[in-house]
Amino acid sequence: PRRRRASSGRPVRRRRRPKMSRRRRRGGRRRR
């Protein structure tokens, strides 16, 4: 298992991201 490094250079544990947030771009409307 590889560890991801933060910009500071320290080894960082991988954070879990909800994958649903990636699909949110489906409605092509922009909010201002």
UniProtKB/Swiss-Prot annotation:
GO terms for molecular function: DNA binding. It is found in: Nucleus; Chromosome. Keywords: Chromosome, Developmental protein, Differentiation, DNA condensation, DNA-binding, Nucleosome core, Nucleus, Spermatogenesis. Testis. Residues 1-32 are annotated as: Disordered. It comes from the Eukaryota. One of its GO terms (cellular component) is nucleus. GO terms for biological process: cell differentiation; chromosome condensation; spermatogenesis. The heterogeneity indicates the existence of other protamines. Protamines substitute for histones in the chromatin of sperm during the haploid phase of spermatogenesis. They compact sperm DNA into a highly condensed, stable and inactive complex. This is Protamine-1. It comes from Esox lucius (Northern pike).
